[in-house]
A protein has these predicted regions:
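Short beta-strand to alpha-helix junction loop
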Residues: 61, 89-97, 136-155, 277-286, ...
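Active-site substrate-recognition segment that forms the wall
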Residues: 18-22, 78-84, 195-330
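C-terminal catalytic lobe of FAD-dependent flavoproteins
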Residues: 291-380
């Protein structure tokens, strides 16, 4: 088969390269900083994988398919890269997003529980539910060990024959012709291919500034880890699930591998440069600390034991970008993970590999034409 060049070895690019290689393509995977690096949107220790997406059924189905593929992959590599912690969706009495999530889970057939306030307090007494009146519990969902998972996918891709190149590439296709013939690395190497897939997250607007500079938005995000008291396992799995409180734009992950109790504000931060931005956390500390004291009283005075700065790479509304470059028929643009994309890597890799190999119609929500210049988030 004709050679394919994938630029970006994050979760999207790694799974695309892996799927293409397994279907017989000769694949070269290029990344400037390495799989799961700290500058990437796929870096960091952990990510939640949950099935609930409000009324957005396509993402529920993709997440469910991805969980199946992740688990099968980890059985061959490292089963500890997925932790079945369960995921708890906290809801106020009137909560349209969680109500529509419940309906979608029921329609698709995803295992779940609808829990009353009394059931919540009985099962998780270490949580002060405050205004939370009910919740959805997804018992089979959980946590992916993000950085290590990406490294594992790239490692398996190499075993399938993928050539990995650590390098930057030229910032845009040359302005002549309808086909891109090669990309040039920072060292001057020309990597030729028949198809080029740019799945490089927050670097997409830097590589294609005229096309994506005002359609993909990289934002600065903080993740904080607090240390539970010595010997207190109430905030570690299995006593504590991963959880989401969209009413206050917070989410968290139980203490896994002694890293601490992870909590973050799920609100788009200021613009951020993934190459040069300083990664010193602290801007969201006060808001997170106040929430921690309210919802998890035993952690009121817990010390901050670690912090990370990463970035989302957002589309205008949270839908992914999967489309051909409008000027180059053999160039694909894949990104817009928008803070929720990591979990979908396996299903997205299947989808893109099939489009590249077989053609077909791209779902309208993923098309470049739907990417506006103003952010108005609709996918959570």
């Amino acid at each position: 088969m004709e050679p394919v060049i994938v630029v970006g070895a994050g979760c999207f690019g790694a799974w695309i390269a892996y799927r293409l290689a397994r279907s017989g393509h000769a694949v070269t995977l290029v990344d400037a900083y390495g799989p799961g690096n700290n500058r990437a949107s796929s870096g960091g220790e952990t990510r939640v994988i949950r099935m609930g997406y409000g009324a957005q059924e396509i993402y529920t189905r993709w997440s469910w398919r991805s969980l199946e593929l992740w688990k099968a992959f980890f059985q061959r590599t490292d089963p500890m890269l997925f932790r079945e912690t369960g995921v708890l969706w906290m809801a106020r009495e009137q909560d349209p997003l969680t109500t529509s999530t419940l309906a979608t889970l029921e329609r698709v057939g995803v295992p779940h529980e609808r829990l009353s306030r009394a059931q919540l307090e009985s099962r998780w007494p270490q949580i002060d539910f405050g205004p939370i009146m009910w919740a959805i519990h997804e018992p089979g969902s959980g946590v992916l060990m993000a950085r290590r998972a990406v490294e594992a996918v790239v490692g398996e891709a190499e075993r399938e024959g993928v050539r990995y190149v650590a390098a930057t590439v030229n910032t845009a296709p040359p302005p002549a012709g309808r086909r891109l013939e090669a990309v040039t690395t920072g060292s001057g190497e020309r990597i030729r291919g028949a198809t080029f897939i740019f799945a490089c997250g927050p670097w997409l607007p830097k590589l294609f500034p005229d096309l994506l500079g005002d359609r993909i938005f990289a934002t600065r995000q903080e993740v904080l880890y607090f240390g539970p008291p010595a010997g207190d396992l109430r905030f570690a799995s299995p006593a504590m699930p991963a959880w989401i409180d969209f009413g206050e734009e917070m989410y968290g992950i139980p203490d896994i591998a002694a890293r601490g109790f992870k909590i973050a504000l799920d609100r788009h931060g200021p613009p951020f440069d993934p190459d040069t931005g300083d990664r010193v956390a602290g801007q969201t500390f006060d808001a997170v600390r106040a929430y921690l004291a309210r919802r998890f009283p035993a952690l009121r005075d817990a010390p901050l034991v670690a912090a990370e700065v990463c970035q989302y790479e957002n589309s205008c509304n949270g839908d992914f970008l999967i489309d051909r470059h409008p000027e180059f028929e053999n160039v694909w643009l894949v990104g817009g993970g928008s803070g929720h994309g990591f979990k979908h890597g396996p299903a997205l890799g299947e989808y893109v590999a099939r489009l590249v190999a077989e053609g077909g119609t791209i779902d309208e929500r993923f098309q470049l034409a739907t990417k506006e210049k103003v952010q108005q988030r609709t996918v959570y």
